[in-house]
């Protein structure tokens, strides 16, 4: 543990860690080699100074090296948010995932239970009847047979159990809130990632580029949402062809009307499940619009759409034809057929 002590000593003087040093430190934490006080010191030193792209890249590499992997097609996408935006909104990325799958792009969705809302991806999917506590092989079967699978983070990241108690005791946001969405167990290289703060939009796109992502959008809504919002502009860093570009988009760019963030307020898992099913059943609402907008971006990332308007049109077709709703039914059936 001398290496860990020297790393904490470096951080105490304000020195930033190299990618390799960060990977080594996070490997030690997730292997159970670091003590709780050492972990707390490192996490808070990074939080207070602000984590660098190299430090996050190393930490994600360590987390990915320990995860239980899932087999998925090369063109699979993930639509995921960091959570922790404090909005308590409906489950946008989860709903968008079924739309994307309904439009013909395989989805390897990674998620967890609620962080700051009453209902995270795992909560709402369980309420809809999806079996979430299945093995990596069974998730792979879901993706193959249903075109969408859900990877429940605790199942695929068992090493996180060594860090969990320290995170709970710190009771504040740490680098781990950023690592989960970047550590997809299916190894997807096409990601739509929502973040809780604008400051992370460009850096996380750079991290994904460092780690070999082919195509990605990292987004933050101007109203604070860790998704693309319909209440105003959304800040985007897009990775394509090895280059990162930053820009803003609005609902109007996709041909969608604006709506206040308040209309996207969610409830508990059961209430959010009813709302999500309503969108899949073709009911018009602001929830449908925001899900379509996020699905459109994911379809661009997945190489299926060229513009947001094109993506919205494909997503609307997936909803109105019943294809998106069929994906949920298939996921429920295949996941529950698991032993």
Curated annotation (Swiss-Prot):
Binding site for anthranilate 2: 167
Family annotation (InterPro entries): Anthranilate_Pribosyl_Tfrase (IPR005940), Glycosyl_Trfase_fam3 (IPR000312), Glycosyl_Trfase_fam3_N_dom (IPR017459), Glycosyl_Trfase_fam3_N_dom_sf (IPR036320), Nuc_phospho_transferase (IPR035902)
Entry binding sites for Mg(2+) 2: 226-227
Pathway noted in the entry: Amino-acid biosynthesis; L-tryptophan biosynthesis; L-tryptophan from chorismate: step 2/5
Any one biological process term the GO annotation gives: L-tryptophan biosynthetic process
A Pfam family recorded for this sequence: Glycos_trans_3N
Keywords on record: Amino-acid biosynthesis, Aromatic amino acid biosynthesis, Glycosyltransferase, Magnesium, Metal-binding, Transferase, Tryptophan biosynthesis
GO cellular component terms, semicolon-separated: cytosol
Disulfide bonds: none
EC number(s) per entry: 2.4.2.18
Chain sites annotated for binding Mg(2+) 1: 93, 227
UniProt keyword annotation of Heme present: no
Binding annotation for 5-phospho-alpha-D-ribose 1-diphosphate: 81, 84-85, 89, 91-94, 109-117, 121
Superkingdom of origin: Bacteria
CC cofactor: Mg(2+)
GO molecular function annotations of the record: anthranilate phosphoribosyltransferase activity; magnesium ion binding
Cofactor: binding details: Binds 2 magnesium ions per monomer.
PANTHER family documented for this protein: ANTHRANILATE PHOSPHORIBOSYLTRANSFERASE (PTHR43285:SF2)
UniProt function note: Catalyzes the transfer of the phosphoribosyl group of 5-phosphorylribose-1-pyrophosphate (PRPP) to anthranilate to yield N-(5'-phosphoribosyl)-anthranilate (PRA).
Family: Belongs to the anthranilate phosphoribosyltransferase family.
Name used for this protein in its record: Anthranilate phosphoribosyltransferase
Species of provenance: Rhodopseudomonas palustris (strain BisB18)
Lineage: Bacteria, Pseudomonadati, Pseudomonadota, Alphaproteobacteria, Hyphomicrobiales
Gene behind the chain: trpD
């Amino acid at each position: 543990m001398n290496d860990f002590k020297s790393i904490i000593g470096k951080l105490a003087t304000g020195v930033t860690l190299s990618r390799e040093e960060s990977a080594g430190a996070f490997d030690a934490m997730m292997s159970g080699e670091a003590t709780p006080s050492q972990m707390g010191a490192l996490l808070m030193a990074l939080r207070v100074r602000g984590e660098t792209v190299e430090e996050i890249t190393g930490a994600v590499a360590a987390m990915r090296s320990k995860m239980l992997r899932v087999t998925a097609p090369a063109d699979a996408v993930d639509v995921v948010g960091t959570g922790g935006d404090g909005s308590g909104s409906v489950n946008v990325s989860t709903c968008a995932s079924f739309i994307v799958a309904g439009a013909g792009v395989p989805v390897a969705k990674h998620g967890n239970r609620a962080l700051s809302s009453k209902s995270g991806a795992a909560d709402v999917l369980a309420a809809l009847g999806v079996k979430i506590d299945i093995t990596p092989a069974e998730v792979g079967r879901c993706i193959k047979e249903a075109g969408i699978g859900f990877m429940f983070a605790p199942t695929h990241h068992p090493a996180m159990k060594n860090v969990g108690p320290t995170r709970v005791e710190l009771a504040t946001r740490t680098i781990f809130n950023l690592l989960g969405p970047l550590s997809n167990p299916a190894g997807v290289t096409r990601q739509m990632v929502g973040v809780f703060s604008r400051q992370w939009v460009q850096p996380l796109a750079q991290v994904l580029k460092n780690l070999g992502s082919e195509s990605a959008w990292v987004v933050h809504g101007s109203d604070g949402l860790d998704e693309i919002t319909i209440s105003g502009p959304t800040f985007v860093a897009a990775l394509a062809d090895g280059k990162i570009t930053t820009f803003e988009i609005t609902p109007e760019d996709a041909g969608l009307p604006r709506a206040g963030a308040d209309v996207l307020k969610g409830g508990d898992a059961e209430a959010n499940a009813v709302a999500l099913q309503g969108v899949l059943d073709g009911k018009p609402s602001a929830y449908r619009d925001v899900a379509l907008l996020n699905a459109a971006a994911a379809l661009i990332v997945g190489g299926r759409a060229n513009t947001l308007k094109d993506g919205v049109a494909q997503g609307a077709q997936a909803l109105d034809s019943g294809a998106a709703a069929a994906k949920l039914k298939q996921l429920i059936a295949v996941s529950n057929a698991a032993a």
